[in-house]
UniProtKB/Swiss-Prot annotation:
This is Putative Fis-like DNA-binding protein. It comes from Xylella fastidiosa (strain Temecula1 / ATCC 700964). Belongs to the transcriptional regulatory Fis family. PANTHER family: DNA-BINDING PROTEIN FIS. GO terms for molecular function: sequence-specific DNA binding. InterPro entries: Fis_DNA-bd (IPR005412), Homeodomain-like_sf (IPR009057), HTH_Fis (IPR002197), Trans_regulatory_Fis (IPR050207). NCBIfam families: PRK00430.1. Pfam families: HTH_8. One of its GO terms (biological process) is regulation of DNA-templated transcription. Residues 66-85 bind DNA. Keywords: DNA-binding.
Length: 90
């Protein structure tokens, strides 16, 4: 079953966003590699695995400036600090 956003506003980037396509390919490969085994908590696992490198790379890009990184991510600085602590990145 193919899932396509029914409303244009659901899609923030172009329909063939390179990042979105890359993520889709990785998820398809992961599901294929499960080889019939159940994946528990896949949603949270994918979010965590995407969020950690996103936070690290944005912080590197902002030369460690958490205020700039939070602004670039579109989140409050307190939220960024909470996530960094949660993932053991501080």
């Amino acid at each position: 079953m193919n899932v396509v956003p029914s409303r244009p506003e659901v899609s923030r980037g172009s329909p063939k966003s390179p990042l979105r396509e890359h993520v889709a390919q990785v998820v398809r490969r992961y599901l294929r590699d499960l080889d019939g085994c159940d994946a528990n908590d896949l949603y949270n696992m994918v979010l965590r695995e995407m969020e950690i490198p996103l936070l690290v790379e944005v912080l590197n890009h902002c030369e460690g400036n958490q205020s700039r990184a939070a602004a670039l991510l579109g989140i409050h600085r307190a939220t960024l600090r909470k996530k960094l602590k949660e993932y053991g990145l501080v």
